[in-house]
């Protein structure tokens, strides 16, 4: 895996890429999403096996993310033409069908390299997922090996948790979901949470 420039707590590396959006080609810049959260996920290749399950799941939940002020962007090293061909392939035949999220082309592999997910020996991306906040700061990174897909529900939960901490200044314990108790991040006040949950 390549070492990249993406670091937690730092500005996410900006980029410009050609994407397929609603069946058409469009130039997308990360900086265009300033003011919104972004879930940026990398996947290995078009016309494969685990990848469509992830992309379709993110697409099917795009509105759930948008309700949180968050956009989802998918990226692979394939061209925009390959993305479009895959989108135009019916789901029953291993295709994607119409999508509610953009798919970005990274044919130069610069995005994958910059975000540290490039599998150099194969020239494809690992399954990297990055949560970028409304200020453009990278808040979360996970990278899966190729054979295991990611959880859209967990990505949604993480966005909700980061947004909660941004707004309220409290911290979210393991498995936190909206409406659950949080912790006041100081020695004395945190005891309220621990006495209730232990």
Swiss-Prot record:
The modification N6-acetyllysine is found at residue 196. It is found in: Cytoplasm. GO terms for biological process: defense response to tumor cell; extrinsic apoptotic signaling pathway; hydrogen peroxide catabolic process; hydrogen peroxide metabolic process; negative regulation of extrinsic apoptotic signaling pathway; negative regulation of extrinsic apoptotic signaling pathway in absence of ligand; negative regulation of lipopolysaccharide-mediated signaling pathway; negative regulation of T cell differentiation. The enzyme can be inactivated by further oxidation of the cysteine sulfenic acid (C(P)-SOH) to sulphinic acid (C(P)-SO2H) instead of its condensation to a disulfide bond. It can be reactivated by forming a transient disulfide bond with sulfiredoxin SRXN1, which reduces the cysteine sulfinic acid in an ATP- and Mg-dependent manner. The modification Phosphoserine is found at residues 11, 112. The modification Phosphothreonine is found at residue 182. It holds the Pfam family 1-cysPrx_C. SUPFAM superfamilies: Thioredoxin-like. The modification N-acetylalanine is found at residue 2. Residues 6-164 form the Thioredoxin domain. GO terms for cellular component: cytosol; mitochondrion; myelin sheath. It catalyses: a hydroperoxide + [thioredoxin]-dithiol = an alcohol + [thioredoxin]-disulfide + H2O. The active site is at 51 (cysteine sulfenic acid (-soh) intermediate). Its EC number is 1.11.1.24. Keywords: Acetylation, Antioxidant, Cytoplasm, Disulfide bond, Oxidoreductase, Peroxidase, Phosphoprotein, Redox-active center. Widely expressed with highest levels in bone marrow. High levels also found in heart, brain, kidney and skeletal muscle. Lower levels in liver, lung and thymus. The keyword Oxidoreductase applies. GO terms for molecular function: peroxidase activity; selenium binding; thioredoxin peroxidase activity. Homodimer; disulfide-linked, upon oxidation. 5 homodimers assemble to form a ring-like decamer. Interacts with TIPIN. Thiol-specific peroxidase that catalyzes the reduction of hydrogen peroxide and organic hydroperoxides to water and alcohols, respectively. Plays a role in cell protection against oxidative stress by detoxifying peroxides and as sensor of hydrogen peroxide-mediated signaling events. Might participate in the signaling cascades of growth factors and tumor necrosis factor-alpha by regulating the intracellular concentrations of H(2)O(2). The active site is a conserved redox-active cysteine residue, the peroxidatic cysteine (C(P)), which makes the nucleophilic attack on the peroxide substrate. The peroxide oxidizes the C(P)-SH to cysteine sulfenic acid (C(P)-SOH), which then reacts with another cysteine residue, the resolving cysteine (C(R)), to form a disulfide bridge. The disulfide is subsequently reduced by an appropriate electron donor to complete the catalytic cycle. In this typical 2-Cys peroxiredoxin, C(R) is provided by the other dimeric subunit to form an intersubunit disulfide. Belongs to the peroxiredoxin family. AhpC/Prx1 subfamily. This is Peroxiredoxin-2. It comes from Mus musculus (Mouse).
């Amino acid at each position: 895996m390549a070492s990249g420039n993406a670091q937690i707590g730092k500005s996410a590396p900006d980029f410009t890429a050609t994407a397929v959006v609603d069946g058409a080609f469009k130039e997308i810049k990360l900086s265009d999403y300033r003011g919104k959260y972004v879930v940026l996920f990398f996947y290995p290749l078009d016309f494969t096996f685990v990848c469509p399950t992830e992309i379709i799941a993110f697409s099917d939940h795009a509105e759930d993310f948008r309700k949180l002020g968050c956009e989802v962007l998918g990226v692979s090293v394939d061209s925009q033409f390959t993305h479009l061909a895959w989108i135009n392939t019916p789901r029953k035949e291993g295709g994607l069908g119409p999508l509610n999220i953009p798919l970005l082309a990274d044919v130069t592999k610069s995005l994958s390299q910059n975000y540290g997910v490039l599998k150099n020996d194969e020239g494809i991306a690992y399954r990297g997922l990055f949560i970028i906040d409304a200020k453009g700061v990278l808040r979360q990174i996970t990278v899966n090996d190729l054979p295991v897909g990611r959880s859209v529900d967990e990505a949604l939960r993480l966005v909700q948790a980061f947004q909660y901490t941004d707004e309220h200044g409290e911290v979210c314990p393991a498995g936190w979901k909206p409406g659950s108790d949080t912790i006041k991040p100081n020695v004395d006040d945190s005891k309220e949470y621990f006495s209730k949950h232990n």
